[in-house]
Structures are given as C-alpha cells and as structure tokens.
C-alpha cells in the first residue's frame, strides 16, 4: 500500500478546491493511504473527509522550530509520494527533509500573475483554474472531480435542530456578506436592496452567515424574514447551514466555495479577484457576476491590494438588480 502526502496549508477556498485533487489521487491510487497537511486553524474544514486517512496540522504561530519538527516527523513517515499543491516558502523548507525524487510540486503562474496585476497583460488560457493546476501533478488536464466536503449524521441532526430553534424552514437563502479583505465585499446598500427584493419576490427566509470580524453583517437590515447568524455558528455548523440552503450568495470567500462542496449552488460576486486567481465556481447551477471589461482587474491574488483608482469600479458597477436577476433565475431552475 502506498503512503501519500498531500500538502495544502491554506486558505479556506483553496483547501476546498484541493478536495477535487484528493478524489483524483484516490482514483489513481485506490489502495493508498492518504495524509493531508494543513494549517491548524483550517483543519476543521476537511474533518470527516472519507478520503483523508490522517490529518496533519501545522501551527504557524510556533515558528521555524515547529516547521523543522514537522519536517522531521514527515520524514519519519516514509511517504512513497508527496504532492505539494501549495508551493510556498514553508513547503519548500519541508521539501528539504523529504526525498527529492518523491516530492512533486505545482508550478505556480507567478510571472503571468505579475504581468496581469502590474502590466495588465493576460497570458492565461481561458480554461485556467486552480483545480486544473493541481491536477498537472497527476498528468490530467481535462475533466476533474467535483469538490466535496462532509458532515456526519450527528452534525446533520444538530444543524437541523439549530435551524428549527431559529424557526428557519427549508425555504432559505444563505448570504455571506463578509470577506477576508474589504475590497472583496459588495456594498451594504446593495446587499440590503437585494435582500428586500428576494423577500418580496420569493418570500424566502434570508440567513446571514459571518464571523466576529465580519462587521458588515451588523449593518444588514432587520426584518422578520432575516435571521442573522453572525458569530453564532462554528465553521462545521455553517457548513451544515449552507448544505440545506436553496442557494448561497457571497463574494470570493471561503463559505462560498464550501457551499458548492456541500452541493448548494452559489452566486459569487467577483471584484478584485477572478478565475486567474482561483476565483471561479464549479457547479453547473452556480453563477459568477463580475465586470469583465475593466483593465484594472484582477489586481491581486487574494483581493488584499488597496484599490488605486478613485472608485472601486469592479464592485460599485455591480448593482443589486443585476445580482437579483441572476439569483432569481437560479431559484426558479
């Protein structure tokens, strides 16, 4: 039996996309034992994943000593193959502890991204995706498995009970207004206008999801049909909430990618990021809303770069009516 290590330490969206690669690794090596290396703060995402035989977490707060300890530990596991689908400084340090001929690392399009962000020249092929990039390590470039995450029966039961206690039925839309970087957030006015239209047209319950830092959630209008769960769910519970939603709406953020991996289509509003940075949907019923005609986007890998124009047109030119028409079509499929 082969022992295989897959490395993807962060961030939430990229870890979700990595589950497609895990499926392919298992298909290619059906009798293998698969270990997955991830940052400690993200480990809950792939907990209970049936393909992962062992989850190894890394605590970056412990610094280089922890990295060296981890490298020695990985070496002692005697892996037959190591797939590094992250390719950052930390994973290169880890590679020093592992046999070079067994270590397979993705080649990131760093030069193309630099030219895109700072020279405004797009040399990416139309079909580029992070999932496709990961699969180059397996020699695959055509069709790829869908991303998948899992919660167990106990978690499903707890989610259903939690929804009942908040009087949330089956007819609800999950909205994730926050993002790691404010530049990726759609405006609160647009969210509130959209929510009013959805309630008026579909009588849907709107469930707001977010963490402590997502202050935009506090600015959502109050209404009998709006249930604001900001900071009231664990990540695992939020996974259950999006699983049972009719639809999920948000920007290029972790819970949007999680929603698709749980089988719920999303409408993803893209501003400073794009498919060239890994922001794209995977389900056929999901939608991307973006302004493709702007010369300045995408402007950074994760949306962290402050906008240098007088207005952030990639977001301000997407109005609530455009998003509403896309969501309403998705709800009536």
Residue spans for each PLM region:
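Catalytic machinery of carbohydrate-active enzymes
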Residues: 1-333
């Amino acid at each position: 039996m082969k022992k295989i290590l897959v490395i993807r330490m962060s961030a939430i969206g990229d870890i979700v996309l990595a589950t497609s690669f895990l499926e392919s690794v298992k298909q290619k090596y059906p009798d293998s034992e698969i270990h997955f290396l991830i940052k400690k703060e993200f480990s809950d995402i792939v907990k209970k994943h049936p393909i992962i035989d062992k989850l190894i977490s890394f605590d970056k707060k412990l610094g280089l000593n922890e990295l060296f300890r981890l490298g020695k530990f990985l070496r002692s596991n005697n892996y037959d193959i190591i797939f590094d689908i992250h390719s950052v400084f930390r994973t290169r340090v880890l590679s020093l502890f592992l046999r070079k001929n067994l270590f397979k690392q993705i080649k990131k399009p760093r030069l193309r991204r630099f030219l895109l962000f700072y020279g405004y020249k797009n040399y990416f092929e139309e079909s580029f995706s992070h999932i496709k990039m990961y699969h180059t390590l397996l020699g695959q470039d055509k069709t790829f498995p869908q991303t998948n995450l899992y919660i167990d029966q106990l978690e499903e039961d707890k989610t259903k009970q939690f929804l009942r206690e908040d009087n949330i039925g089956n007819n609800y839309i999950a909205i994730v207004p926050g993002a790691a970087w404010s530049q990726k957030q759609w405006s609160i006015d647009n969210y509130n206008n959209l929510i009013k239209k959805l309630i008026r047209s579909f009588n849907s319950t709107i469930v707001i999801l977010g963490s402590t830092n997502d202050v935009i959630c506090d600015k959502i209008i109050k209404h009998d049909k709006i249930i604001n769960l900001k900071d009231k769910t664990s990540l695992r519970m939020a996974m259950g909430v999006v699983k049972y939603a009719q639809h999920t709406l948000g920007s290029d953020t972790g819970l949007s990618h999680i929603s698709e991996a749980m089988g719920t289509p999303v409408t993803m509003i893209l501003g400073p990021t794009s498919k060239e940075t890994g922001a794209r949907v995977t389900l056929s019923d999901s939608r991307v809303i973006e302004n493709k005609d702007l010369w300045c986007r995408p402007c950074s890998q994760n949306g962290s770069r402050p906008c240098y124009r007088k207005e952030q047109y990639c977001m301000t030119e997407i109005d609530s009516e455009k998003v509403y028409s896309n969501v309403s079509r998705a709800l009536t499929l």
